[in-house]
């Protein structure tokens, strides 16, 4: 793996578990979600499977082709997210392995931070030798308002 994998986008399609931690003033959100991403179909589906803060569990399907967010029934703005490392993120190297360091059991991860109006921490699994694509593992965001 490169010293600093700087992936800008995820592969065309992927699915997995995404951990989201968000802190805003006195509100704390921690959810575990089953997620799927499809750039060809322009869809992102996130199904909350567990909430540590008694948030109601829900499924949200963002259809960027039709510009509709199902579940919340609102119009989508912008483009389909690339889920890559944000441009202004700082690499907190080195790349490391989570779990067992035995072939097929551990996962290689790279950590990045952003310190703007709070603190954001992102963990990605870089793919391939170049590290130009990645899959998000965790997003942790603390916002100071």
From Swiss-Prot:
**Gene Ontology terms for molecular function:** carbohydrate binding
Q: How is it modified after translation?
A: Glycosylated.
Has keyword Glycoprotein?
A: yes
With respect to pH, the record says:
Optimum pH is 6-7 for hemagglutinating activity. Activity drops rapidly at lower or higher pH.
Temperature dependence comment: Thermostable. Retains hemagglutinating activity after incubation at 60 degrees Celsius for 1 hour. At higher temperatures activity drops drastically.
Q: Which UniProt keywords apply?
A: Glycoprotein, Lectin
Q: Which residues are glycosylated?
A: 73
Function, please? Lectin with affinity for N-acetyl-galactosamine, carragenan and glycoprotein porcine stomach mucin (PSM). Has metal-independent hemagglutinating activity towards erythrocytes from rabbit and human. Hemagglutinating activity is not inhibited by D-galactose, D-glucose, D-mannose, D-fucose, methyl-alpha-D-galactopyranoside, methyl-alpha-D-glucopyranoside, N-acetyl-glucosamine, N-acetyl-mannosamine, D-fructose, alpha-D-lactose, beta-D-lactose, D-lactulose, D-sucrose, fucoidan or glycoproteins thyroglobulin and ovalmucoid.
Instruction: Give the record's subunit note.
Output: Probable heterotrimer consisting of an alpha chain and two beta chains. The alpha chain can probably have different glycosylation states.
Protein name in UniProt: Halilectin 3, alpha chain
State the species of origin.
Answer: Haliclona caerulea (Blue Caribbean sponge)
Tell me the organism's taxonomic lineage: Eukaryota, Metazoa, Porifera, Demospongiae, Heteroscleromorpha
